[in-house]
Design a protein with these regions (language model features):
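C-terminal structural cap/anchor segments
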Residues: 270-351
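Short, low-complexity, Pro/Ser/Thr/Gly-rich segments in the mature regions of secreted, periplasmic
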Residues: 391-407
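Short, non-transmembrane alpha-helical segments in secretory-pathway proteins
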Residues: 15-22, 29-30, 170-176, 223-268, ...
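A short local loop/turn or secondary-structure capping micro-motif enriched for an aromatic residue
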Residues: 116-117, 312-316, 402-404
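Preferential activation on post-signal-peptide N-terminal prodomains/segments
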Residues: 1-244
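Exposed beta-strand-loop-beta-strand "reactive/processing" segments of non-cytosolic proteins
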Residues: 173-212, 216-220, 249-301, 308, ...
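Hydrophobic/aromatic beta-strand positions that recur at structurally equivalent sites within the blades
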Residues: 98, 108-109, 296-298, 395
């Protein structure tokens, strides 16, 4: 019927089954990987029953294989990164591998008579998952991004505040001492006219700034060493945050963090990764108009940058039962002129049909969450609409009115 089912939580078991299938097929002596076109991949996923596991970031395929002891088959050298692993009835004995950011697609093919798609889906009760359709199916056009027809939520505004408001000077000084270690006695403390405090070692080789808006920022001139690779750099980042700020808010309130994005970076001869972490409260992602809760960069196995903008959220206030929200199609239909004007910078009157088609094609993602808006002490329930250009628009969940935007 052209519908899809979306699952964005409790996916660990599905991923483990996928990696097991990848290991088994790659262990066959006559298995091979070939590159296919975007059209071939799209047909296999859209025109047949299929299952796609999408990551929020690309993982180097060689490291993925090494991490999960997946043998390197003929043609594996073609695959640089992977952000999607998929199965389709179009070729039930295949595993499709994609790096969507680079528009690269591959097929790992088994010579055995095996139905990998059935193996991957036999335990899943699809009736319990959210039904979605492509943007093109609902609004017209060829956009194959998925949106739900309707939704409901019990989200309400929640008061938030910067963790520094409840974090004592002693705690922040302890954090500074941990960052500089035995060199802390040689660190200068500088306070500017706005009240921002910077600890500096040497001539700026290391700096740690505590801003009045609650943001903590650490910069470190790293020395040349050996690049760690994706997983080792990620482990370095996780360990650093655990030791310098914890994975909870500094006042002890629990937040659940997740890896939102990862990109390879370089500085001169040094190589590494920058990681962006998002946060969830009450199983809902918290979005910022600007920035993310935690951003950290690793170069040659060393922390070169760390930015922390973690908030505390009050819970236990007024609650409501689940109720209908504005459906995504209606959000787009009511706001396409606003979206078009911002995206194009054209505030003049335009052909409404052309503007609507432009926006419908530009939709990259739309989902519910809580948004931190500038100069608002409440997290607002919202639809978060991301476009292919990287612009993000926030609309009130129950009224579909614009409440903010960002990148």
């Amino acid at each position: 019927d052209g519908s899809y089912r979306l699952k964005d939580s409790d996916t660990t078991e599905t991923l483990e089954e996928c990696l097991l299938a990848l290991r088994e097929i790659s262990g066959e002596s006559d298995a091979s990987i070939t590159e296919i076109t975007a059209e071939q991949y799209g047909e296999a996923i859209r025109e047949y029953r299929s299952l796609a596991i999408n990551f929020a970031y690309a993982i180097p395929y060689r490291e993925l294989c090494a991490r999960w002891e997946i043998p390197r088959v003929q043609g594996a050298e073609l695959v640089i990164g992977a952000d999607t692993l998929a199965f389709s009835q179009a070729s039930a004995q295949s595993i499709f591998i994609a790096e969507r950011r680079e528009n690269k697609y591959y097929r790992l093919y088994s010579q055995r008579d095996v139905d990998l798609f059935s193996v991957m889906t036999e335990q899943e009760d699809l009736s319990k998952l959210t039904a979605c359709y492509t943007v093109g199916t609902i609004l017209g056009g060829e956009n194959d991004r998925l949106i739900p027809l309707s939704a409901e939520s019990n989200l309400v505004p929640l008061r938030w505040y910067e963790e520094s408001e409840e974090t004592s000077q002693d705690v922040r000084r302890t954090l500074a001492e941990a960052l500089f270690g035995e060199n802390f006695d040689f660190v200068r403390r500088i306070t500017d006219t706005f009240g921002n405090v910077t600890y500096m070692y040497g001539y700026g080789q290391k700096t740690f700034t505590q801003r009045v808006d609650g943001v903590l920022e650490y910069k470190n001139e790293t020395s040349e060493g050996a690049a760690g690779g994706f997983f080792r750099d990620l482990e370095t980042a996780l360990s650093f945050v655990s030791a310098h700020g914890t994975w909870d808010s500094l006042d002890g309130r629990e937040l659940r963090f997740f890896l939102r994005d990862a990109r390879a970076v370089s500085a001169g001869k040094q190589e590494g990764y920058r990681f962006w972490f998002g946060a969830k409260m009450l199983d809902q992602t918290i979005y910022y108009e600007s920035g993310v809760p935690i951003e950290i960069e690793v170069l040659d196995g060393q922390i070169s940058y760390y930015r922390r903008d973690v908030i505390s959220v009050e819970t236990g206030g007024e609650t409501y039962g689940f109720r209908p929200v504005q459906d995504p199609a209606n959000v787009i239909a009511r706001n396409y002129n606003h979206i078009y004007n911002v995206m194009t910078g054209n505030m003049l009157a335009v052909n409404e049909e052309s503007a609507f088609e432009y926006v419908a094609q530009a939709v990259e993602d739309i989902r519910m969450g809580l948004v931190r808006i500038a100069n608002d002490d409440r997290l607002r329930p919202a639809w978060i609409l991301a476009t292919e250009s990287g612009q993000v628009f926030y609309f009130s969940l129950y009224e579909a009115t614009p409440i903010g935007m960002g990148k």
